[in-house]
Amino acid sequence: MASQSQVLVEEKSSVRILTLNRPKQLNALCFNMISRLLQLFRAYEEDPSVKLVILKGQGRAFCAGGDVPPVVQNMVQGKWRLGADFFRDQYTLNYVMATYSKPQVSILNGIVMGAGAGVSIHGRFRIATENTVFAMPETSLGLFPDVGASYFLSRLPGFFGEYVGLTGARLDGAELLACGLATHFVPSTRLTALETDLCKVGSSDPSFVSTILDAYTQHPHLKQKSAYHRLDVIDRCFSKRTMEEIISALERETTQELDDWSLTTIRALKKSSPSSLKISLRSIREGRLQGVGHCLTREYRMVCHVMKGDLSKDLVEGCRAILIDKDRNPKWEPRRLEDMKDSMVDQFFERVEEEERWEDLKLSPRNNLHALRIAAKL
């Protein structure tokens, strides 16, 4: 089966090592991979002989996101429900990971974007390295940070989550550790030794795993130009109520001090889909007050509207401009933030009405919900 070659499984004593294996596609998650991961995680949770699950990627990426082009192709052909099924399974997997009763260690030694964050950040342990590149670039594609991102981004220090989710800014391993998205930082040259020691774990008690990881972890310095050094500016600007106010605040910062970071941030926001920016901001803000299950259920409503194309076709246009034609010149609709009214935003958060057999995402209550460990290291 293709799914078995795309997710490799190693059994080492009481540890299971899963490797995402589509290196040419930067381990982008297709439907078969998501189904396979969901099957394996559920089986391991029921198997008393399994104490720890390690997840990593083959090649230079952990996982660069979901396999979006086939989903968009189905949208164009009017088969939006196939995309809805893809996201239903993906969000269910995210929920299982967020509520997993056994420790999961994700080794983020490379590119981590979009769906790659969904299969790692919800787990208890996230290992960054000097090769880590993290981003949530959905607003530049006409989508929104999903896979439970409204839950984990909203729990970052201050308004750093809004900054990361709205701009698609890239973070390195040191920044990931500093803001709490990573729990540990381990040099890539030490990963083989770390994995060997983790495979000696004979208990599902997270403290045993934590002790091993703590022995390997380092605390790298942030680069001088790191966005994390600008938390005061980020909080001042991204705490504003609306997207228009956020951009105005950033523009005021540039009048006081000409700064490449502010200009780059404004440019990224102005190139993104106005509808995506507005629904993303609201989603992250609502996530501050919601549990992970509630966030995923809400995001499923939102993504079904995107799949159906009844409220916006920006995902189709963004995919064309960024992934297919690569002219990087999407024609968003509406083109201006001020034309995306609050009443239009509201519709993304409502049920998909007038559709037979459509249902909200139903996530069964689980007793294992562990608080997401977002602990800033600075």
From Swiss-Prot:
GO terms for biological process: valine catabolic process. Its EC number is 3.1.2.4. One of its GO terms (molecular function) is 3-hydroxyisobutyryl-CoA hydrolase activity. The keyword Nucleotidyltransferase does not apply. Keywords: Branched-chain amino acid catabolism, Hydrolase, Peroxisome. It holds the Pfam family ECH_2. It catalyses: 3-hydroxy-2-methylpropanoyl-CoA + H2O = 3-hydroxy-2-methylpropanoate + CoA + H(+). Gene3D superfamilies: 2-enoyl-CoA Hydratase, Chain A, domain 1 (3.90.226.10). GO terms for cellular component: peroxisome. It is an enzyme of class 3 (hydrolase). It comes from the Eukaryota. Substrate binds at E138, D146. Pathway: Amino-acid degradation; L-valine degradation. Belongs to the enoyl-CoA hydratase/isomerase family. Involved in valine catabolism. This is Probable 3-hydroxyisobutyryl-CoA hydrolase 3.
